[in-house]
């Protein structure tokens, strides 16, 4: 289903409330990776464009406690849970609530104890276009106290998709990031980006940040408070820039090193797209020092994202 007014149009799918295409008319270029064949999204292992939940990213040991009650979740990455479990929101068929030329809203009702999470959760995902700005608004209500962390998992490439993302310039408005252990889960230690390869406070070419010990990124950056934007991406080849803003405290910057997909019609290689997953912190349900991802029945989960696309002149 296509939607859009002005310089940008988008296509999305009801499976996983997935963002399938973001087409920039001025340059006649699609800016995100997709699987090409819609039927392939029944097994979207790389989560291309998907809405991930109930809890995107990782929760250690696939469990958390609420009010003294221990909830055991479905494991799908060793002993841990990633992106909501074996059958997360990315694999669900979402219903269309309303739509127009400029927007569409999907919703999905997750039953109590689905993948082990407490409470019936009613979630919605609204995609809208105005001029060259793509907005994503994620909402959720629960019947029981639970934890929620919904993200959009689009892989961006401003260089006509076929090439890797190494030559993109990236700026991330973060003075700190979370240290990961060998399972890619935060240890709880907050580290300054100063003097490290994780310093993207100024626009930096991705490949210039690599070292003999570091050839990829998959970390949660802690967004500076009162920031006007979270990240900016720029391509000197296509002369396109992307500015990302959100109300979330973190962003997972992932350079697509685990990408792998091949059929007769489509091949996607590692490093061909990068993700900027605005989010609550990974494993926050088990770390009281992290911003809370807890949602009570009296509350509404609200996650807003804007992608502003411009031609560099």
What are the language-model segments listed below?
Residues 158, 162-211:
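A conserved active-site cap/scaffold subdomain adjacent to cofactor or substrate pockets
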């Amino acid at each position: 289903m296509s939607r859009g007014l002005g310089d940008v149009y988008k296509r999305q799918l009801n499976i996983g409330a997935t963002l399938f295409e973001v087409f920039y008319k001025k340059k006649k270029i699609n800016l995100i990776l997709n699987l090409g064949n819609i039927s392939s999204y029944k097994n979207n292992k790389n989560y291309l464009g998907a809405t991930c939940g109930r809890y995107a990213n990782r929760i250690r040991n696939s469990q958390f406690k609420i009010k003294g009650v221990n909830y055991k979740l479905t494991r799908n990455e060793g002993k841990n849970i990633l992106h909501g479990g074996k059958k997360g929101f990315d694999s669900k068929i979402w219903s269309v609530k309303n739509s127009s030329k400029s927007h569409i809203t999907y919703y999905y009702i997750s039953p109590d104890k689905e993948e082990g999470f407490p409470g019936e959760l009613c979630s919605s995902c609204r995609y809208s276009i105005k001029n060259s700005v793509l907005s994503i608004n994620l909402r959720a209500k629960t019947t029981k106290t639970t934890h929620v962390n919904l993200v959009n998992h689009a892989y961006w490439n401003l260089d006509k998709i076929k090439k890797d993302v190494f030559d993109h310039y990236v700026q991330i408005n973060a003075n700190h990031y979370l240290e990961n252990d060998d399972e890619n889960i935060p240890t709880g230690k907050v580290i300054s980006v100063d003097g490290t390869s994780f310093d993207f406070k100024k626009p930096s070419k991705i490949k210039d940040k690599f070292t003999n010990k570091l050839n990829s990124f998959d970390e949660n950056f802690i967004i500076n408070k009162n920031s006007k934007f979270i990240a900016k991406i720029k391509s000197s080849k296509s002369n396109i820039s992307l500015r990302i803003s959100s109300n979330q405290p973190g962003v997972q910057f992932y350079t697509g090193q685990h990408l792998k997909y091949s059929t007769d019609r489509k091949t996607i290689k590692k490093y061909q797209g990068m993700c900027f997953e605005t989010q609550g912190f990974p494993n926050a349900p088990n770390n009281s020092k992290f911003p809370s991802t807890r949602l009570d029945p009296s509350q509404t989960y609200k996650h807003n994202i804007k992608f502003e696309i411009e031609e560099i002149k």
